[in-house]
Amino acid sequence: MRRNTIDIITLGCSKNLVDSEKLMRQLEANGYKVTHDSPNPQGEIAVINTCGFIGDAKEESINMILEFCEAKEEGRLKKLYVMGCLSERYLKELEVEIPQVDKFYGKFNWNELLADLGKEFHDEMAIERTLTTPKHYAYLKISEGCDRSCAYCAIPIITGKHTSRPMEEIIDEVKLLVSQGVKEFQIIAQELTYYGVDLYKSQKLPELIEKIAQVPGVEWIRLHYAYPTHFPEDLFRVMRENDNVCKYMDIALQHISDNMLTRMRRNVSKSETYELIEKFRREVPGIHLRTTLMVGFPGETEEDFEELKEFVQKARFDRMGAFAYSEEEGTYAAENYEDSIPQEVKQVRLDELMALQQEISADLSHNKIGQEFKVIIDRKEGEYYIGRTQFDSPEVDPEVLIKADGKRLFSGRFYQVRITNADDFDLFGEII
């Protein structure tokens, strides 16, 4: 056990990661040595930043807390603190059921941890972070919460109403991160397209992205977690006119059947969804679309699922994730629908859908053979340098593998690469 050392463990999404990075900076400013997701944590204090989105995530968070409780009981840890979405939602229950934790914090009051440690929260450092990502890219959170009322989703229950960050504050953070070597920004929010409505009374995402694109040193901007209803179409122009805005959009569509979209309370129709996809590809030639789909939502019939498969085949998404519905207490679906589809049926549908997408992804990847792309290098693994094109977000999308062959490439630098081969997941290339 190392004195004056704190281990931070982050579970869940990139939005949680940003919170952990801000906490780390505050702790370091108060004289602590801080590690993040260490495979061998040895600090005298641990802070677990939890996820409470779906059942599997909650289970992972509970298991991690119990693992550190055991370390505390064995004398390998002095203090254990828990923050994030799980404790935001289940604070009272957790305090009763896991008394070994010294204190639980919600998602928005983790700054109180500093006071409980007898330290100071530095307001003047509110936008500063200790990056846990490679130093050339960062996640940039532009808002919290969500005003949508999707039937299956617990996020609004956990994080509350949509709250946009002031544009000036975001730009200041971008400039600070650029000064520290960041070139690539993953723009994240629970719901990107609503940005600005609460602060400025209108959608301001296109204006914000254009301002970020104009900051010297910003090489790539990539957009995550958009919503299809009332999509701000001026964003198409921003993507066309600014080379550093990646031709990439992560937009969760969930389903295509009008029956399912209505039951999910998505406020969008099948025809509107197809129209939006066509508009993306018409207005931003070459754009790569990532989406997320759901199977097994209450009331999903075989006909609904067949429509979904047909949609995947027709839309040919460049990137796609999918998951099986799990009932979340407090949501509209949990209170109004019976979770009647057997788990084995959900799994069969999920496997079938992902098998379809794997064929499409492999086909699209093989179509890139012979083409040339600008690639940023993330790291070296064994005999290969690992990089990404503008169409690939870290952690979730395919990578480009470049054989070292005695060459020395540098993490965070861009290279022109010709694609020479592809497998079901990744591309292989050579430096031009």
Residues of each region from the PLM?
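Active-site proximal loops enriched in glycine and acidic residues that flank catalytic Cys/His/Asp
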Residues: A189, Y225, L253-H255, T291-V295, ...
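Conserved SAM/AdoMet-binding glycine-rich loop
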Residues: K78-G84, R89, L94, S179-E303, ...
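Short acidic/polar active-site loop segments enriched in Thr and Asp
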Residues: D102, K183, E219, D318, ...
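Extended hydrophobic-aromatic, low-complexity segments
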Residues: K247-Y248, L261-T262, P285-H288, E303-F305, ...
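Proteins enriched for Cys/Gly/acidic motifs involved in redox and nucleic-acid/cofactor modification
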Residues: M1-Y195, D234, M249, S271-R282, ...
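Terminal RNA-binding accessory module
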Residues: A333-I432
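Conserved, mostly hydrophobic/aromatic
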Residues: C150, I170, I187, L223, ...
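Glycine-centered loop/turn positions within well-structured domains
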Residues: N111, R148, T193, D258-N259, ...
